[in-house]
Amino acid sequence: MNIYCVTLNGPAPWGFRLQGGKDFNTPLTVSRLTPGGKAAQAGVGVGDWVVSIFDANAEEMTHVEAQNKIRAATDSLKLTLSRAFHPAGGEQKDSLTSSSSQPKYSFAPSTAINKMARPFSASPGSGSAGPVIKPVSYALKPALSSPHNGHGVAPCPVTVKSKPADKHDAVQAPAKAPVSSGPACRPPWVTDPGFADRYHPDKSSTVVTQHTQPLQPTPMQNRSSILQAAQQSPAHSSTATPLCAACSKIIRGRYVVALGRSWHPEEFMCCQCKRLLDEGGFFEEKGSIYCSKCYDNRYSPNCAKCKKIITGEIMHALKMTYHVQCFLCAACKLPIRNQAFYMEEGEPYCERDYEKMFGTKCHGCDFKIDAGDRFLEALGYSWHDTCFVCAICQINLEGKTFYSKKDKPLCKSHAFSPL
């Protein structure tokens, strides 16, 4: 056990938050740190156990007793802690996970004074702010379609070769390429039937995929021949002579083999622009063959913002597609990419700017109220449910009648006690 002591110079806030206690049957631990706060600068880590507060044994303290002990500190706060084990990069990973895996909301404090404190709990269906985004890694790997017996949607290099017509040549075909059932740029909610079930309608998600262009032709000396001599030896001439898939005529001389069929070289062309495909990649979709340019124009998605065709990285968010450089934070104007973002009045915000502009703090502990935290509104402020206690006896007032004096809540027993 790695025990260490820290002394934080006052005044509050101290820059950390506790969880657990004797009343929870769990040790007091540091649950959250304020970035750049006093505790973080002193080397305190998330998950560290609190051994003592001002030499008072913390193992015998309840959660409220520990809070009161810390609140009583004015000039300095002395803590003895036990270091929790953090794997390499663990703290950063925990921080990222906690900030991106839960929905976060902005809470506007009520200006009216409540005489009955009502608890609220942040849930995906409540709150006025937009939902949080859980980034999802999604990559589509296009299949290469080699010009031999096989099927797929992919670019393919084509080679022109001539061979003597009086020799019998076997067709050399490379290994079959992976089979793809659709174009490589389809959105995930089209190709994945379970997409709508995994992402609730009131949530938004971002997915970055890659739209891959056709491969460049390989050097001539490294290619496998896809043009073969059509004339075979007399013994095989009746069965081995190929037929053109375009004109259905017998091919005499060299020919192209692709997708399990044969073509005259001058008839193996894009079905739209009619450009010959004997040198370059091609795409096959629903039995038709396209060059890379025509395929992009026909099947590549359009950006929901600029309406232009997307090539390269595709940003999937709010069930639409964007260029990465078109989906920006409304405040800092930087690309959000695969990070969490929040919607406010129809505009996306990165996590840092959203918390800066719309975040709400607890009036009791001065810490931010995070998504998932139980909280209540009283006396014109927002409070964590564990922070709304009587200012004198520290009894929890959640759901109970209370009195107020100098903006501080009091229970019935201390309603007329001096502060």
Curated annotation (Swiss-Prot):
One of its GO terms (cellular component) is perinuclear region of cytoplasm. Residues 1-85 form the PDZ domain. InterPro entries: PDZ, PDZ-LIM_domain, PDZ_sf, Znf_LIM. It comes from the Eukaryota. Residues 174-232 are annotated as: Disordered. Residues 242-300, 301-360, 361-419 form the LIM zinc-binding domain. Pfam families: LIM, PDZ. GO terms for biological process: actin cytoskeleton organization; atrial ventricular junction remodeling; atrioventricular valve formation; embryonic heart tube morphogenesis; heart development; heart looping; muscle structure development; pectoral fin development. Residues 204-232 have a biased composition (Polar residues). GO terms for molecular function: actin binding; metal ion binding; muscle alpha-actinin binding. It is found in: Cytoplasm, Cytoskeleton. Keywords: Cytoplasm, Cytoskeleton, LIM domain, Metal-binding, Repeat, Zinc. May function as a scaffold on which the coordinated assembly of proteins can occur. May play a role as an adapter that, via its PDZ domain, localizes LIM-binding proteins to actin filaments of both skeletal muscle and nonmuscle tissues. The LIM zinc-binding 3 (LIM 3) domain provides the structural basis for recognition of tyrosine-containing tight turn structures. Anchored to cell periphery via its N-terminal PDZ domain. This is PDZ and LIM domain protein 7. It comes from Danio rerio (Zebrafish).
